[in-house]
Curated annotation (Swiss-Prot):
The gene is trmFO. Belongs to the MnmG family. TrmFO subfamily. One of its GO terms (molecular function) is tRNA (uracil(54)-C5)-methyltransferase activity, 5,10-methylenetetrahydrofolate-dependent. GO terms for biological process: tRNA methylation; tRNA wobble uridine modification. It comes from Methylorubrum populi (strain ATCC BAA-705 / NCIMB 13946 / BJ001) (Methylobacterium populi). This is Methylenetetrahydrofolate--tRNA-(uracil-5-)-methyltransferase TrmFO. One of its GO terms (cellular component) is cytosol.
Amino acid sequence: MTNPIHIVGGGLAGSEAAWQIAQGGRRAVLHEMRPRRGTEAHQGEGLAELVCSNSFRSDDANGNAVGLLHQEMRSLNSLIMRAADANQVPAGGALAVDREGFSQAVTAALEEHPNVTILREEVAGLPPETWGSTILATGPLTSPALAEAVGALTGRDALAFFDAIAPIVHRDSIDMGKAWFQSRYDKAGPGGTGADYLNCPMDREQYEAFVAALIAGEKTTFKEWEATTPYFDGCLPIEVMAERGPETLRHGPMKPVGLTNPHNPTVKAYAIVQLRQDNALGTLFNMVGFQTKLRHAEQVRIFRTIPGLENAEFARLGGLHRNTYLDSPRLLDATLRLRARPQLRFAGQITGCEGYVESAAVGLMAGRYALAEAEGTTLAPLPPTTALGALIGHITGGHLEASEDAGANAPRSFQPMNVNFGLFPPLERMPRNETGKRLRGPEKAALKKRALTDRAREDLAAWIGGEDLPHAAE
């Protein structure tokens, strides 16, 4: 009997890796410590539990890098994308999911797969060498014992930062005499209608008082080691954004553009708080961009000053959780193996990707790399022109820059990253209009994104088919 491939961690990356291995005909053993041992952020014991937002972000495969990543993962039989599509809830142009239904779908698919064994146990340190090929997908909440073991093996400390969790509100406690349903610019998306967000308007006086309250509100106190731990810019607590300047929020999560208040259509709101459906029943809505480290009592007091939320009942209040990630360009090779111990691969947020979809995507590739290795074959390198290739390239070497002082392979500061078009190689030729004239402004940006996504689809199809890739060397 062939040796199984072990996966440690049953989050999005680990679940996707196990699925890819099992679908490839190899046995996968998935180790998940919950419910035997919980974490600071998880609520239940299901696999692929979403601990922060319920949004997979934009599903636009022509104009958005994460939407392109969705499409690429679907083309590679992603379990995470299959479960997301089956459990989508309205969210404008985004793909958002019923978090419980999503986790249940992933859990059921893996529990029922004949090639998957799920062991509910903690792997406290490094896996034994007798396991052979192993994928560590322990996520941002990697246990201290395992984090210390990895640090001891690599000789480098893992880096850490915080993610903050947004509150969830009961729909029936929102005052619809002040709030209204509308997606920004009335944009419909997967499962959406163009009226998928609840909007709560503020005038200037209300907004300024709200910002002042956020800044003055009592915050969660840090342990000594946490005091110097930075935040990831893509998930800043709302009060930290407020501290960056009085206009920051109304140009960020509270921007009022593309929305019209039907209760007072002639008056433009100064700022708008949006809430997004959080479950299939539509009974729960999360506050978009309102991740916070305010104390719970302060959250209730301050958030009830938002028009429409004066009597809000909270199903969950916001909080903080620690996120640990590797200095991956130094520590991992091109197939996500640990250079110091090639039996071990890493996947998910611990590698320095950021976001649900990105974590699952890295898990997908880690699973395929491990499967190919177990079968005695080698996967052709992913085209860097694809979303998958750009993301893996960023993690395993895209952040390297030559330096006379530090050597040719010295990485500059490595930070967690969402997939974005800045990670893609530039186009050989910029888009032009029908007359051949070079474009400028929004039209140029839209056509450039379409050209990048068209190129990615062409190159991924060639990679899947084993064809020569004309753009891979750009």
